[in-house]
Amino acid sequence: MILPTSEDRRIIWLQRWLALVALALIGTTWRLWTASTEFPRIPWFSWLCEIPNWCDRVALAGLISGLVSVLVLAPWRERFAAPKVRLAIFAILAVSGGMLLLLDQHRLQPWAYQFAWIVLVLATAPAGRALMLIRLLTIGIYLWSAISKFDATFLATTGPDLLHGLWQTLALDPHLLDGNRASTLAWGLPLGELAVALLLAMPWTRRFGLLVSIVMHGLLLVVLGPWGLDHQPGVLLWNLYFIGQNILLFGARIEPVAGSERRWGLAEMGISLALLLPILEPFGWFDHWPAWAVYAPGAERVTLLLDAAAAERLPESMQAHLGSPQWRDGGRVVRTDLWSLRALSAPIYPQGRFRAAVASAIIERYQFDEGATLVVESRADRLTGDRERRVFRGADAIKRHATSYWVNTRQ
């Protein structure tokens, strides 16, 4: 593959690649963006709860039109580089995309958050500076993702699960993962991400880092694909995006354009925030996904339990999302994670606040005054995996807990 060597041409390829993958991701998760299912829509601010669902569709139409414009116009540099044209396109992307994200916390999927920062950079920085900033963002994603997985819970659960999926897909000897070997080998997953971050950060190892990153994402495609753990298409598309993006960012040498350097600006401020805010995540002051804690199972757990009578009152569409009876009286767990995957083709937002909001919305919708219990487990201790548990019984106690968060939990 022959890559363009000029900054302007490389950034055009990156813009088109981002627009293409973003359209594909929106297409595979379209129900998430249209507010067209029973799954609760939880805005970030309570004053947004009254906005009708048709506004989501108008904003989505604007976002799609902006992405299509980038895809179609980017090859015509003279037209796309015209200040008025670029301003109009990126204004449409910013307004429509921002509205969609504000109207539902669930939409802050990791790829959507990443793309939002990249669009800010593309809109406000010259080509050379934009490439440098997006490189920094990419390195930061690998770094923070690795740090989030140096965790007892990951090494005991998700890490071994991924390894078992890889072993099964590649038909490797399963006995190699017997006993504690899987947990020991799971250390290689965050260490691999950390190695990619360090290799990409240093110019003299960047090409090797690119190769390692491609192998890593390729293996994830194998493990998470339909021939492995069969995860949602969005997960596969995001990994595919990283392969293409990294080739464009860290591939063949790029010839700088005169005048592409500049001082501190809006793009630099945005990427600095994206790289620094994850520091707050372990203290509970920043959400898991924006901190790039992906596939990190140590987040707060929130589980809604219904007794047998309450479970029977659910409509048939909700019965499919109930877990097996776990109580002596036949009580059931409401699997909101499965509900999200089946209804929206997207993983549920992992924050305890959001899961409590979804539980509260279910109780309010089906008027469960009694028969509902919410079990809230704290984030896992990084060294031991231990959690503290709180139990809220009845609709009033559950709603009080849901409204105790700083961020909105109303639908």
Residue positions per predicted region:
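Alpha-helical membrane-anchoring segments
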Residues: 1-411
